[in-house]
Design a protein with these regions (language model features):
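Conserved lysine of the Walker
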Residues: 19
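Phosphate-binding P-loop
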Residues: 1-6
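Walker A (P-loop) phosphate-binding loop of P-loop NTPases
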Residues: 16
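Hydrophobic anchor at the beta1->P-loop junction of P-loop NTPases
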Residues: 11-13
């Protein structure tokens, strides 16, 4: 439902938890739409079979993830999925998702829904001193958290980001028992 309603989804978890696998499953749903997709990543991991796909990859000394996010905006994208968010490009990404390009998907290393939002803050601080918490809260709709434990890989937490509470903290709502 989140893909169909063009919500921005952040897939979080540690190494080997299945972030890329879940993101590829979500991209398979995106591929069923007629949306123009500009897929951005460092390493070719994501797979999208959409006929309306433009895939962009970083190149050392030539194009960073931030460069590609900004370039993607010139390509009239409907959706901007990104491989792994790991640096200052987090700011460019939430700006892009929040200014007419909803329906994005991205991955991040974090162990909880709140942790994923706080990690976004840390990454954004690589670009600016003051973190735009309201923009993060307005832009990221869903956080899916994956874990790998004795039972294998699984979805441990699925939360909706409702905005900021009166104290300025993120307000999250669990999306059911997992």
């Amino acid at each position: 439902k989140a893909v169909a309603t063009r919500q921005n989804i952040l897939v979080a978890g540690g190494t080997g938890t299945g972030k890329t696998t879940l993101t590829n499953a979500l991209l398979a749903e995106v591929a069923r739409t007629t949306d123009r997709i500009v897929l951005i990543e460092d390493t070719r991991e994501l797979q999208c079979t959409s006929p309306n796909l433009i895939a962009m990859r970083t190149k050392d000394g030539v194009a960073t993830l931030s460069d590609l996010v900004r370039s993607a905006l010139r390509l009239r994208p409907d959706r901007i999925p990104i491989g792994e968010v790991r640096g200052a490009e987090a700011l460019d990404l939430i700006k892009a998702w929040g200014t007419g390009h909803p329906g994005g998907i991205g991955t991040i290393h974090a162990g909880s829904g709140m942790g994923a939002l706080r990690r976004m803050e840390q990454l954004i601080q690589e670009a600016v001193v003051t973190v735009p918490r309201a923009l993060i809260a307005e832009t990221i709709d869903i956080v899916a958290v994956l874990v790998r434990d004795g039972h294998g890989r699984r979805l441990a937490e699925l939360v909706r980001v409702d905005g900021l509470d009166p104290r300025g903290e993120y307000s999250l709502t669990s999306q059911g028992d997992i």
